[in-house]
Every structure is written in C-alpha cells, then in structure tokens.
Amino acid sequence: MNDFDRTSYLDYASAMRHPNNFSNTTATFFTQDADINIVHPFNNASGAQAYFKTVIEPLQTSFEGMYRRNDISMTGKFEGHNWVSSTGYYVGHFARDWIGIKATQQLCYLRFGEFHRMENGKAVESYIFFDIPELMIACGQWPIDIGPGLARGHTGMIHGPASHDGIIQITPDPSEGQKSLQIITDMLGSLATKDEAWRPFWHDNMMWYGPGAFGSFVGIDHFASFQIPFESQFDGWSGGSKSNGLTKHFVRYGEGNYACSGGWPSVTGVNVKSFLGQPPTNEQVFFRVCDWWRREGNQLVENWVFVDVLHALLQLGYDPLPPTT
C-alpha cells in the first residue's frame, strides 16, 4: 500500500473533523471524474463537484455545525489496486429537512462507511454508505417496526472498536493483515450452511453492529437469531466472496487485526419469505453491503455492517422514504 494514499486520506478525514464548507476538501481528495457510488436515494455522482453538490452541501445545510468523526480507518490492496476505507459518523444539529426526513431541531448522528480506490493520492472510484434508516429510527420516522430476525436488535448510536485502535496510521506487520483477511474470507464462505459452519470463526460474546433496520446484537446465539432467519428469507442466499456469477466484492483486504469488504451488490437470493414486512416477490434481490471486522487472536470479536436497505426495499416495490417537496 502506498503510504502517500494513507496520508492523503487521513488528511481528508482530519479536515472534516471541524465544521467548514468542505468544498475544497472534497475537490482536493476526489478526482474531477471520480466514479462515486452512493446508497439510495443518491446512487451515483460523477466527480468531486457533483458529489459535493448532491450529497455533502445539502447535508451541511440540514445539519448545522456538521463535522465528521472516524472510528476505523485502514488501507490495503485488492486485485492490484490501492484502497482506503473508514467508518464513523457525521454529526450535527438537525435543523432543516433532509431527503424527506423531518428536522428534529436536535443533535443527530448519521453513520457512514466508505471505500476509495486511490491513484496518486486521489480517489478515482468510491463506494459510500449511509445508514439512513438508523437516522430515521432516531428521529422517530422509520415506518417499519420489525427486523429480519426473530426480533429487531438494539438500535442507536454504534460505538467504535472496544480496543480504541481503529485509526491505523502506521503500516502494521503485513502478516497480521493477511491473517485477518484469511479469517474473514473463510468465515464468509461458511455463511448459509446447514451446520452453521461460520460459528467457530467468532468469539462467543461477539458484537455485531448491524444496520439500523436490522439492529445490533451481542453474543453468537443472539446474532444467530438474526442471521439464520435472514438467510431463510432468500432462497440461494449467497455472498460476494463466492463465485456465484451474480455478486462480487469490489474490495476485500486486511490490515493489522482489522479486515473489511464491500460489494455492489454483495449478497443476493430469491425472496421467498416476508422481509421487513414486505410480502415475498419470488424474484432475485440484490443487496449492497459492506463490513469492517476486528479480531483478537484467531476469532472475530466485532463487526460493523452496512446494508443499503432502501435500495433492497425498492426492489420489493416499497419506498420507506417520505416524499420530498
């Protein structure tokens, strides 16, 4: 990994730690023709200026005093390309409506996760996730009161790593990153198996920080109470680490005791049971997903997950976003 790319990204993150207009910050980090993929309702922006005008500037207008805090930041290589990634929160006073969500006139948090393919210190290809349902739940405006599991998990602000070492600034031993990558690759390949072959990869008291619409869970059995019903709602459930011809990870790498991955889409299956209150369509559904993991020794202890739930629900014929004026 080019340390120049790491420094460039850390500078970008640092510039967003305090309120400013962020236009210069955005223009400096992204190329003018960067391919920027964003969760629904944005979906795509071409270049730094379009991303600023479409996403960042309206968010700043709605969230007074907006700034950004990172909880994890890591770099790595995938298929010969340099990547940087991070997850954390945008923070501000929710003063004006945003994408149809009514302002609360209170402090609000918008969780983000992002990946950038880098060339010469600039982002040329990006995938940016926002947990919009989590914000809507916090504002009392999410219209669905169930999750995909036996019960929706905890909803609320998600913490960074319990070890408080998620911002990696100095390249660690490459063998540790390779170990992290191998563990998550093997674990992902064990999902959706009848014998729950994924269990040995996890600590018994693991933390699964899920998207707001799903909720978060502590302990492997409580996680299973979500994961197994979720898998059963989609026949042929399969993820981006497998060569299924339908989904593919755009990135997957490890650094130190952390690993990350993302797919656009990453998971797919035929919807055969009710999902988030919507009747089955018996059609293929595709999920945009990304993850960060932290391991201790040979087991995964924490997992931060994003799913573009709005995009998934649209495929089922339901739009939970309020109409905009």
Where do the model's predicted regions map?
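C-terminal and inter-domain tail/linker signature
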Residues: M1-T325
